[in-house]
Amino acid sequence: MEKYLHLLSRGDKIGLTLIRLSIAIVFMWIGLLKFVPYEADSITPFVANSPLMSFFYEHPEDYKQYLTHEGEYKPEARAWQTANNTYGFSNGLGVVEVIIALLVLANPVNRWLGLLGGLMAFTTPLVTLSFLITTPEAWVPALGDAHHGFPYLSGAGRLVLKDTLMLAGAVMIMADSAREILKQRSNESSSTLKTEY
């Protein structure tokens, strides 16, 4: 048993690598999906209700009547989403998310890029977690069941809550990048001192 505990105790390096890869995979995959209408449609309630983002939409107040389920095609809803700038905003967000993934993956080559990716991966969940406050669809609606509203998260709310893990993981990869930058600076300083003497 002790052998396994020692083995597990040395898992922090591999764990950090897995956190970095996981963050990159999530941002890359979801970022690429932002170019597909069903994913763009699915973020409409979050963006339309957000005081930080609703200005990107032409008519955020009208979104409810144009919501669709994943896999469902309604031409009038698609036309409204197009006119609303839903797809333009989603495409821009997709570009940002793919850039975050690439920056996070760039860490072994350039720690500063990795640090920037970690910072961006940290700030993204700060915005998305605010949706728990601003988006009514984050909570189970009052449709007759006794369990609705706070603390009963809907599927959308549960999805948003998982961003707390992204937030924590981003702190870890930022700390790792910063530690490596400081170590590199320290090594450069000591090698400069040695060459001067």
From Swiss-Prot:
Main location class: membrane
Entry-linked InterPro entries: RclC, RclC-like, RCS_Resistance
Gene null: resulting phenotype: Mutants are more sensitive to HOCl treatment than wild-type cells.
One BP annotation, GO: response to hypochlorite
Topology class, membrane: Multi-pass membrane protein
Transmembrane segments: 16-36, 86-106, 113-133
NCBIfam families found in the cross-reference section: chlor_memb_RclC
Protein name, UniProt field: Inner membrane protein RclC
Species annotation: Escherichia coli (strain K12)
The encoding gene: rclC
